[in-house]
């Protein structure tokens, strides 16, 4: 008789995505004070296309944590960062539970620390984008490394009137969304000056 439910036991017994990604360029950690476990997520993200090429993890957690990390890693490989926009704890937990079965209240932190580690890795990638940016004008979209000059050029060339139109042209505003108000401000300024 297995200690864990069948699907969790299967992933716990034969994990496929442990270790570091070969070309890791984003790392994030999530930890639980409930049981003392941690998950560290290693991502390889294509700098041009912003596609997650590989996702790996390390953990000292239980079978529930390992299974949740396995499902997370499998689900995000091949996804573009824009595909993950707006993913929150509840949606993530729902996806994990649809794959593994419902986690009891005392096991939810096992999945939540995986999501925390993913968020931290994406934050790490954004920080790398900011560090690598070298330009005269401000960096508006840190998720995709899009400068004020680029956005102004798109607004002028395409007569973009919405943040969504700018996003369709260069992905700005389609990641975390924190730059959307700045993009709208640039659109409004262009409209006033035209």
What spans do the regions from the language model cover?
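Domain-level signature for proteins that mediate thiol-based redox and metal-cofactor handling
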Residues: 1-194
């Amino acid at each position: 008789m297995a200690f864990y439910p069948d699907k969790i036991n299967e992933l716990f017994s034969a994990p496929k995505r442990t270790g570091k990604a070969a070309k890791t360029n984003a790392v994030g950690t999530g930890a639980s004070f409930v049981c003392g476990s941690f998950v560290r997520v290693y991502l390889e993200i294509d700098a041009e296309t912003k596609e997650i090429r590989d996702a790996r993890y390390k953990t000292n957690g239980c079978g529930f944590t390992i299974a949740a990390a396995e499902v997370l890693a499998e689900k995000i490989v091949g996804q573009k960062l824009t595909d993950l926009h707006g993913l929150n704890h509840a949606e993530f937990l729902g996806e994990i539970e649809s794959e593994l079965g419902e986690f009891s209240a005392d096991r939810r932190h096992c999945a939540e620390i995986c999501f925390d580690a993913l968020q931290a890795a994406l934050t790490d990638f954004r920080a790398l984008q900011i560090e690598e940016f070298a330009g005269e004008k401000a960096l508006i979209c840190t998720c995709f490394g899009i400068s004020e000059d680029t956005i102004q050029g798109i607004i002028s060339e395409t007569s973009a009137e919405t943040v969504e139109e700018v996003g369709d042209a260069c992905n700005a505003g389609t990641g975390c969304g924190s730059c959307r108000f700045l993009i709208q401000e640039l659109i409004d300024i262009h409209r006033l000056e035209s």
